[in-house]
Amino acid sequence: MKFQVDRDILAEAVAWTARALPSRPSVPVLAGIRMEVGDALNVSSFDYEVSAEASLPVTTDEPGTLLVSGRLLAEITRSLPDRPVDMSLEGSKAVLTCGNATFTLLTMPTEDYPTLPEMPPSTGSVGTDIFAAAVAQVAVAAGRDDTLPVLTGVRVEIDGDTITLASTDRYRLAVRELRWNPSRPDVNAAALIPARTLADTARSLTSGAEVSIALGLPGQPGADSATGEGMIGFEGGGRRTTTRLLDGEFPKFRSLLPDEFNAVAELPTAAFTESVKRVSLVAERSTPVRLSFSEGQVVLEAGTGDEAQAVETLDASFDGDDIQIAFNPQYLLDGLTAIDSDTTRISFTIPAKPAVITGKPAGDDPAQPDYRYLLMPIRLAG
């Protein structure tokens, strides 16, 4: 086996593939990156949960396959000079040469490496930038408690040309709808995807114009052929990744979103975000930021008489009876930074019920905003 490849292309592919390497592999070969040379160089990794594979152009007259330490290969390729990279298999060792630098790496038996799962049939495609932004908006609200695995996922619902993404950790709920290009106009499916894996995948597949989404539900065509478990795959820009779906029943989130409100505030997103950041500097762990809305303004407060305190007043448009409400400052900031509008709209029912944070629709558009962030308030003393 012998090949030559561009240094930057190789380094990017290896770094991307190494993301899927397990931190504590159950068997040594899972710490490896597999390199297979044929018409192209395929660089892959797999930990039985997530697979990653990148295809890149290569010059070769000796095809073959090798398996080397993934993290070591990533560190080496990242530090190489800007020269073509030559790599060959010599007995049980891989020799990598770039400029005047030569590295000799121990290989692992490729026959012990698991077979990568096949990509399910494509369900449709969506623009990479749109998809990455939508996933980032929603993944922020996913739970991080592995004892509640259902809440660590993002619910993906496909209905024709619309995808709905939703996540919740019980304290907030993020929902985003976006248009896409389905493979069939009548496609209808739902899946629960690990949030961290989905967010990482969406961020890393932006090199192409579109990302193809391939969903294989349990017991249906496209499921993992080895286990029968549900699986989803993403492909774009010469890169492919798959992950197993989470089991469990996601909360019926649509019933949590109110249709009618008693008060609505509108504020400049950037100024409001900065105000929350400043005021929350004095908020100790789990201490809320208090918001008092009245005609023409909102007063932000944090801290108590026995601690450091902060107060700031910000101009705001407000329609409804005066309201005082308190939020976890980090959860509030997570929602505000996900808003892609210059103006933030906060809609209230009563102070004890969740508020809904959205961007202000352009003009007088009455349509439902494509992103909604529902945030539970913290009960105020007294």
PLM regions with names:
Residues 1-382:
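Structural preference for solvent-exposed beta-strand-turn elements
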